[in-house]
Amino acid sequence: MHEAAAQLEPPRLPELFCGMARVRGPRPVLYPVSCSPQAWASGAMFMFLQAALGLLPQASEHMLHVREPQLPPFLNELTVERLAVGDSRVTLQFRRQGSRTLANLLGVEGGPLQVRIELS
């Protein structure tokens, strides 16, 4: 994903991937009807981060699970500030340590929130 985003100008994710095998070349093959930014894809990076960081919010239960986070290879540290979970805002720090990604709860604002961090 990072390699694909870095090849486009301005840097961004492609609107779609067609499923053909990857071939060597200077950049991904452009597909004119899909290579213009479209609003439906604007949330792709947030969904990517949610999956990579293992964020599973349960707002009605006042709970946030962080399950086996994994930072991508190009990123050694990431801080997520004031992430909304129901009426609460949570700040988390993720840091690579060897092959593992560690998660640290830095703070909770607003309503009550239980944060469960499960590392592999």
Residue locations for each model-derived region?
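Non-catalytic C-terminal accessory modules of carbohydrate-active enzymes
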Residues: 1-120
